[in-house]
Amino acid sequence: MVVAKKSLGQHFLMDESFLDRIVNALPPLNSLRLIEIGVGLGDLTLKLLDRYPLKTYEIDSNLCEKMRARLRAEKKPFQLELVEKDALFLKEEEPYFLISNLPYYIATRLVLNALKDPKCRGLLVMTQKEVALKFCAKDSQNALSVLAHTIGNATLLFDVPPSAFSPPPKVFSSVFEVIKEPLKEKALASLAQAPFFEEALQKGFETLEDFLKACFSSPRKTLSNNLKKSVSYKEKLDKVLDFLALENQPTSVRASEVKDYLKLLKSVLKG
């Protein structure tokens, strides 16, 4: 019997209907490699192997051993490459699509890593509902939604109740997807100077991420007050105010009220 480890944020999805809904929600992969973070008890992994070849990253050696045992007992039409490694160090050489029931405590960081990675073309993940809502929020409600919608389209798909897991978490989970869009990536890459597009895209994402941290540092305060406290951007506050004036937005706006962060950042970086 496998006991979930609190230190790794393990909650195993057991409900067959939700496992099927996740697999059925995958978009057409075409030639993309499918990458999974966290093998868990193997239930989602085995369902995926009925349809796709799969590479899975799992840090827990006990779960890796259980997965190997299940594969010996249950033959599948497609092969699994099981990598016993921390997914924070996930690095692929070919384009891929990410799928995962992410551990709550590290979900945001793993999603941001995937969004930042030019090789990742999209993701379908389950997180704590609160986190999913942040990534999928419209307009500029928070930094995570700006990042997700600047590089692609983020969509909340469905909720999963605590009763679907073992052990049950204290909160609801949600499944959402982010599908990257080449035109948005091109615009994001234009923020950076680099010899190769993928390098420019990654640098552009990191530049926007850093800017948003400053803008949303105190969400209830005005944008200008937040930037005044920023070592990196306080000297460029005049450019921000000029941009807001051109966009017919008051200088007292909060970060969540800015209409176009990519356009704003381009204006700030110019000259």
From Swiss-Prot:
Disulfide bonds: none annotated. Its main location: cytoplasm. It is found in: Cytoplasm. Keywords: Cytoplasm, Methyltransferase, RNA-binding, rRNA processing, S-adenosyl-L-methionine, Transferase. GO terms for cellular component: cytosol. The keyword Transferase applies. The keyword Cytoplasm applies. It catalyses: adenosine(1518)/adenosine(1519) in 16S rRNA + 4 S-adenosyl-L-methionine = N(6)-dimethyladenosine(1518)/N(6)-dimethyladenosine(1519) in 16S rRNA + 4 S-adenosyl-L-homocysteine + 4 H(+). Pfam families: RrnaAD. It is an enzyme of class 2 (transferase). InterPro entries: KsgA/Erm, rRNA_Ade_diMease-like_C, rRNA_Ade_Mease_Trfase_CS, rRNA_Ade_methylase_Trfase_N, rRNA_adenine_dimethylase, SAM-dependent_MTases_sf. GO terms for molecular function: 16S rRNA (adenine(1518)-N(6)/adenine(1519)-N(6))-dimethyltransferase activity; RNA binding. It comes from the Bacteria. S-adenosyl-L-methionine binds at H11, L13, G38, E58, D86, N101. Its EC number is 2.1.1.182. PROSITE patterns: RRNA_A_DIMETH, SAM_RNA_A_N6_MT. Specifically dimethylates two adjacent adenosines (A1518 and A1519) in the loop of a conserved hairpin near the 3'-end of 16S rRNA in the 30S particle. May play a critical role in biogenesis of 30S subunits. Belongs to the class I-like SAM-binding methyltransferase superfamily. rRNA adenine N(6)-methyltransferase family. RsmA subfamily. This is Ribosomal RNA small subunit methyltransferase A. It comes from Helicobacter pylori (strain J99 / ATCC 700824) (Campylobacter pylori J99).
